[in-house]
Amino acid sequence: MKVLQEKILNEGKVLSGDVLKVDAFLNHQIDPVLMQEIGKEFAKRFKEENITKIVTIESSGIAPAVMAALELGVKVIFARKRKSLTLQDNMYVANVYSFTKQETNEISLSRNHIDESDRVLIIDDFLANGQAALGLMSLVEQAGASIAGIGIVIEKAFQDGGKKLREQGIRVESLAEIASLDNNAVTFVQQETAEVK
């Protein structure tokens, strides 16, 4: 997705060979026009899949998930990382290791909002080692729902998460695939190296 790649090049910051900071438009400050385009792109790619629900994880997956849901005319349910007083019982639970935060989180979805009749599209902001996607898949599978695919805003293709998911037969659609973050530069899969400002 060219507009997303341009945003990454212009506003993203490479912090190391495996960390890309995109808080200027995706996971702290949100660019709503970009999110709308991302939502349209996910909807276009998954329009034939009869999606009934989108599942994501708080908090950075919510904006792209909501925009895709708006385009597809379905609801979004987001997995919580923290316990809530209003959501104590009747939860599906999975453990997810966060590469960025270097910690394991228990994530949960209410059983009241997803069941075996749902055909789910999972959406998240990043795909690196695949732990968040696997955790979300576990929650969807616990509900007995089917997984139509996974939509990723930015995939770090140099890490093995995408490969692992695709080897399991999961359809993964990534809007920007990064081959490398070496030398303070973003290299997109099948693209030339571009220096990040």
Curated annotation (Swiss-Prot):
The entry's keywords: Cytoplasm, Glycosyltransferase, Purine salvage, Transferase
Alphabetical list of InterPro entries matching this protein: PRibTrfase_dom, PRTase-like, Pur/Pyrimidine_PRTase, Xanthine_PRibTrfase
Pathway membership, UniProt: Purine metabolism; XMP biosynthesis via salvage pathway; XMP from xanthine: step 1/1
GO molecular function: xanthine phosphoribosyltransferase activity
UniProt catalytic activity: XMP + diphosphate = xanthine + 5-phospho-alpha-D-ribose 1-diphosphate
UniProt-listed CDD domains: PRTases_typeI
EC number: 2.4.2.22
Subcellular localization(s) per the UniProt record: Cytoplasm
Binding site for xanthine: 20, 27, 156
GO cellular component terms, A-Z: cytoplasm
Pfam family, one: Pribosyltran
Binding site for 5-phospho-alpha-D-ribose 1-diphosphate: 128-132
GO biological process: purine ribonucleoside salvage; xanthine metabolic process; XMP salvage
NCBIfam families for the chain: PRK09219.1 (NF006671), XPRTase (TIGR01744)
Family: Belongs to the purine/pyrimidine phosphoribosyltransferase family. Xpt subfamily.
Assembly: Homodimer.
Function statement: Converts the preformed base xanthine, a product of nucleic acid breakdown, to xanthosine 5'-monophosphate (XMP), so it can be reused for RNA or DNA synthesis.
Protein name as it appears in the record: Xanthine phosphoribosyltransferase
Organism listed in the record: Bacillus anthracis
Classification lineage: Bacteria, Bacillati, Bacillota, Bacilli, Bacillales
Gene name of this polypeptide: xpt
